């Protein structure tokens, strides 16, 4: 419906903006545990996979249809819970960075530390489980984890689109005609346009 389409477009914009701030982080607090299922009925992404890094397999890839009642609030709640799980990271691009030698120097956002990469590995794998590319992405990451860097290796593939796909899935949007889950942002942005 037209109203649903406008809502989806607004939610995509909101999630992309939040994701830009949430995953690049300069300032972050300690990560929080997720809320219990009786407080926020969400399938934790980590429960969608099993096994340790290097031997991870997919347990669940489907999304449940919850209905469109109060969907905006649910999507925001799901995304906020994950932001807390990652420590409420915030990027302030309006301030000067004293470590940059000049305004034109390359700025690279901080990455997760090896211990943090290991802590969130199954959650990020869980995000991938709702995308069409889930099997080969997780298999390729298993090979990375089995390599020289070991289980604390960072994700080989950018996972922000998988995260947004998972948020929309857990938000209750199960039908591809409402939101096409994907491993690349352009897929659902094209759908929204």
Q: What is each of the regions a protein language model found here?
A:
Residues 13-22:
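Bacterial N-terminal signal peptides
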Residues 2-13:
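Bacterial N-terminal signal peptides that target proteins for export
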Residues 30-31, 49:
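Extracellular cell-wall/glycan-interacting regions and their flexible linkers
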Residues 25-29:
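Boundary at the C-terminal end of the N-terminal hydrophobic targeting segment
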Residues 36-178:
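N-terminal capping segments
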